[in-house]
Swiss-Prot record:
EC number: 4.6.1.-
Known glycosylation sites: N250
Organism placement in taxonomy: Eukaryota, Metazoa, Ecdysozoa, Arthropoda, Chelicerata
Keyword set, alphabetical order: Cytolysis, Dermonecrotic toxin, Disulfide bond, Glycoprotein, Hemolysis, Lipid degradation, Lipid metabolism, Lyase, Magnesium, Metal-binding, Secreted, Toxin
Provenance organism: Loxosceles apachea (Apache recluse spider)
Protein's name according to its UniProt entry: Dermonecrotic toxin LapSicTox-alphaIB1c
GO biological process terms, semicolon-separated: killing of cells of another organism; lipid catabolic process
Family label: Belongs to the arthropod phospholipase D family. Class II subfamily.
Cofactor: record remark: Binds 1 Mg(2+) ion per subunit.
Gene3D superfamilies given in the database record: Phosphatidylinositol (PI) phosphodiesterase (3.20.20.190)
Amino acid sequence: WIMGHMVNAIAQIDEFVNLGANSIETDVSFDSSANPEYTYHGVPCDCGRTCTKWEHFNEFLKGLRKATTPGDSKYHEKLVLVVFDLKTGSLYDNQASDAGKKLAKSLLQNYWNNGNNGGRAYIVLSIPNLAHYKLITGFKEALTSEGHPELMDKVGYDFSGNDDIGDVANAYKKAGVTGHVWQSDGITNCLLRGLDRVRKAVANRDSSNGYINKVYYWTVDKRQSTRDALDAGVDGIMTNYPDVIADVLNESAYKAKFRIASYDDNPWETFKN
């Protein structure tokens, strides 16, 4: 999965997919009542990027729905996964469940079209704080009470705080999560970060009793760091330059071993060689 980083304006969906992304990451900010409000990152952000592009969250979802609904004039067949980077740092811990419920209702109405031929992309809820695990239970409760528990089949999870892998496993246990787990590791492109924790996550993914299904690394903009991440065995790379990742995947060393994921590749299934 080539994951376009910080895609917060509707116009950027086309831009990143046309550069080779089959997945995008979108920032979600919340108001003081735990309603998802804007797709917005703000300053500071990655080096070389404009930090302030934004849409109202529900408007972004409508644009995203068009981009992922077969038959729509804006449809991109290859856009198959969306990571919502949930900026819950502005919330109190006891608002996490409400944030999950409100997020689910927004998605149900504006992205999934109330279960009636909505957008088809898989969705990852990426949460920066392990203490906010109730966002997951709230999300699930809302979809169930709205009569669409089947949409949970399209939803996965990530805790993005680079926490100890044992602590992450524990948070999932508390949230009742037993699958659909993506594990991120990374740092802003302005700084360097080694691959030690990525290798631990990959080892967990590949062990018989691990909780992780997929591992992705962020934010990778250079060819050599792309090669290093692929050599470590990641499933996804988040980038500001999807064309760079696509170029490396075309190199002879990687062409035989990796391919770009399509809609038929289940993102919740651990890949077995």
